[in-house]
Amino acid sequence: MPQIFGRTYSALELGRRIGRPEQLGGIREFTFRDGRALGVRAFDVSSGAGLRFTSLADRALDVCSLEFRGIPLVWRGPGGIAAPQYYQPGDDTFARNFFGGLFTTCGLGNFGPAGVDAYGEFGMHGRINHLPAEHVAARTVWDGDSCTFEVSGTISEAQMFGENLELERTLRVELGANTLLLRDIVTNKGGTRRPHMLLYHCNMGFPLLDLDSILEVSHRSLRPRDEQAKRGLTCWNRGGDPDPEFAEQVFIHEPLACADGFARAMMINRTLDEGRGVALVIRYDPKQLPALFMWRMLGVNTYVMGVEPANCPTIEGRVEAAKRGTLPMLEPEERRSYELSFEVLSGAAEIDRELASYAALIAADSTGPAALGS
C-alpha cells in the first residue's frame, strides 16, 4: 500500500479522498517548444512522495532531471536538451549535446572515444542516446493496493549492412515511493555478431554535490585512470569548490555485490533538506555491469560527479577493448538484460541505515579485499 505524507492508505481509502490519481502523483506527457529542444517528446513523472523526474522519449527515454522535494539532485549540461537531428558522429557532438541528467545512455556499440574498426565508424559514447523511442507508452497500473507509474519504449540502433540492435526500456516508480527502477533489454536483431558496449552515465550535481558531499562506493579495488587522476586519489569521492582550472579525474573500480546481489554507489549531502540530509543511491547488478567508472569534474559550469556502471572494463573505447580482449559481443538474436535502481534517502536515520547495512555486508564478504569507499 502506498505511503502518502507519512500515512499508509489502501486503494479504497485513497479513492475516497481524491478525484484522480494525478492529485497525488502521476505521468504528464509534453513536448518542448523552444531552442534546440524544439519538438522533443518528454514525460514528467511524480511519485507523490517528493520524487520527480523527466524522461526524454526522443533521447532514448534517458532521464534528464531528478528532484526530491524540489531539490535538484543531478547536473544539467550547459548545452541543454538537443533534438536527435543535432547528432553527428564527430568527436565533439557528445559534449555539445550532453544534457547530463540522472543518466545518459552510452552505447550500444561503443562508449569512450570515437573511432573506426572493422565494424565501421562510431562516435564518442555511441549513438543510442540521440535516438528517439518508438512504441512509447505511459501507464498507471493498479495492482491491489499498489499503484505503479510506468513509461516504456523501444529504441532501434540499425543500418543497412551494419548493426541492428534494439533496446527495450522500462522506467517504473510506485506511488508513495522514492525509488526509480530502470530495466533495459538489448537484443541483436541482425544476422551477424556485433560489438555491444553499454555504460550508464549518471551525473550528480549541485546542490547534492557540494563542499561537504561524499560518495560511498561498494568496491573491491580502485585505481586512477591516469596521472591527473592520481593527483586526486586522496579525495576521489569528495566535493569541493568549483575550480576553473580543474582537469577531469577518472577512477576505475571493481564493483562488489552485497548480499542482495547488487553493488552500490551513494552520494550523501547531510546539509540538504534543512539539515536532515539527502542521499542518492544507485544500485546495479555487477554480473550484468561488471565495471564501474567514476568521473570527478569540479570545474566551473561543469561541476559534476559521475557514477558510470558499464558492461566493459575498458573506458578507452571499442578499439582498445578489442585489443585487450574485453570487447563484449552479441550473437544474432542474443538478448541481455540490465537492471538499475535510483533511490533517494531522506534524514540521518535512513542514510545511516543504508550505510551500516551494506558496510556490514561488505565486511562479511570473504572472497577478497573489499572496501566501502570513503
Residue ranges of predicted features:
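Surface beta-strand/loop "capping" patches
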Residues: 249-250
